[in-house]
Amino acid sequence: MQVRIIAVGKIKERFLSEGIAEYTKRLSPYLKLSIVEIPEEHRGTRAPAGQEELAKEKEGGRILAAIPERAYVVALDLRGTEISSIELAARMHDWQLAGTNTIAFVIGGDLGLSDAVINRAAFRLSLSPLTFTHPMARLILVEQLYRACRINSGEPYHK
């Protein structure tokens, strides 16, 4: 199975980059992971709401262009469904049994995801009711993917 994480913005904090690199390495026996970083749309510090919406739409267009054809799309969204690690593992297993070869997880920038991206998603996932920075959400996602792979392989994992 292939997993593509499509995220707006670059990781600036070294500790997050190192954590993501570590889990990417750990995931390699289980799946092929690629991460695509979409440039943030530049806007003024006090941009009017209309300009922010336009920026979100432009980012959304770049996200949609990065989604592989026929990929199962999961949008990380505060209004999405909260699931446990075991439920994520079960869903990934089910998606694979249904013939899904590629899963695309999308993470928006500070403006969130455009309506077009949300509408393209087959599933909306909330990592937590807590608020995370988008780079932190990326680290949590790759850790949870690793945990799901361990669960599906019948290997021990921290509970």
From Swiss-Prot:
Stored CDD domains: RlmH-like (cd18081)
Swiss-Prot/TrEMBL keywords: Cytoplasm, Methyltransferase, rRNA processing, S-adenosyl-L-methionine, Transferase
GO molecular function, one term: rRNA (pseudouridine-N3-)-methyltransferase activity
Catalyzed reactions per annotation: pseudouridine(1915) in 23S rRNA + S-adenosyl-L-methionine = N(3)-methylpseudouridine(1915) in 23S rRNA + S-adenosyl-L-homocysteine + H(+)
InterPro entries per UniProt: Alpha/beta_knot_MTases, RlmH-like, tRNA_m1G_MTases_N
GO CC, any one term: cytoplasm
UniProt-annotated binding residues for S-adenosyl-L-methionine: L76, G108, L127, S128, P129, L130, T131, F132
Pfam families with a match to the protein in the record: SPOUT_MTase
EC number: 2.1.1.177
Subcellular location per the Swiss-Prot or TrEMBL entry: Cytoplasm
Record-stated family: Belongs to the RNA methyltransferase RlmH family.
Listed NCBIfam families: PRK00103.1-3 (NF000985), PRK00103.1-4 (NF000986), tRNA_RlmH_YbeA (TIGR00246)
Functional summary from the UniProt entry: Specifically methylates the pseudouridine at position 1915 (m3Psi1915) in 23S rRNA.
Record-given protein name: Putative ribosomal RNA large subunit methyltransferase H
Gene encoding the protein: rlmH
